């Protein structure tokens, strides 16, 4: 697979065990120009170390629950790399207390909304923001998990969100 000259945004890298980390590595191994995002300063140092490990030069802060952050991400990528050839959406989040115990005992309206905003809607928000900055035949991919269609203990609200 030759991806030389292709610009691909990968979201959701949290550790070297993340599916998104493996995807970014495969993209890099096939000569893609990979750009990544991280949520906030708390994750910055960890994600930048992973970017260095993969020899990724472009890493941008972007809270996917904030439209202005997504617009800034788009503008920064456009300025530094040009249009995108792909987006890999691997971002997911739910409040920790929503991922244990019985689903109905721990779920709240705010936690449910937050899990869906980050884990699901943010893919649409990225697509909307980048719609005019994608090269022809660009691909947008979002990831799911077996817990979205089978019962997985403690996956709870994430099963519905993904």
Where does each model-flagged region fall?
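Canonical Rossmann dinucleotide-binding motif of NAD(H)/NADP(H)-dependent dehydrogenases/reductases
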Residues: 3-36
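Catalytic loop of short-chain dehydrogenase/reductase
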Residues: 12-21, 92-132, 136-162
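Residues at the C-terminal ends
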Residues: 28-29, 79, 135
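Helix N-cap at the beta1-alpha1 junction of Rossmann-like dinucleotide-binding domains, i.e.
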Residues: 40-43
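Conserved hydrophobic beta-strands of the Rossmann-like cofactor-binding core
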Residues: 7-11, 87-92
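Conserved Rossmann-fold cofactor-binding substructure of NAD(P)-dependent oxidoreductases
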Residues: 65-80
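Local beta-strand N-terminus motif with an aromatic residue
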Residues: 56, 83-84, 112, 137
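Rossmann-fold cofactor-recognition segment
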Residues: 51-68
């Amino acid at each position: 697979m030759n991806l030389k000259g292709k610009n691909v945004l990968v979201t959701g890298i949290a550790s070297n065990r993340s599916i998104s980390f493996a995807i970014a590595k495969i993209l890099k191994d096939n000569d893609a120009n990979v750009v990544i995002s991280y949520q906030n300063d708390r994750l910055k140092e960890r994600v930048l170390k992973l970017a260095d490990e993969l020899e990724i030069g472009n890493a941008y802060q972007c809270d996917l629950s904030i439209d202005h952050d997504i617009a800034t991400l788009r503008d920064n990528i456009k300025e530094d790399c040009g249009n995108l050839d792909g987006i890999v959406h691997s971002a997911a989040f739910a409040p920790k207390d929503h991922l244990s115990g019985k689903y109905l005992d721990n779920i709240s309206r705010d936690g449910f909304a937050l899990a869906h905003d980050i884990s699901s809607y943010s893919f649409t928000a990225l697509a909307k923001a980048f719609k005019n900055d994608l090269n022809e035949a660009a691909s947008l991919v979002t990831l799911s998990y077996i817990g979205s269609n089978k019962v997985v203990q403690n996956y709870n609200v994430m099963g519905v969100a993904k």
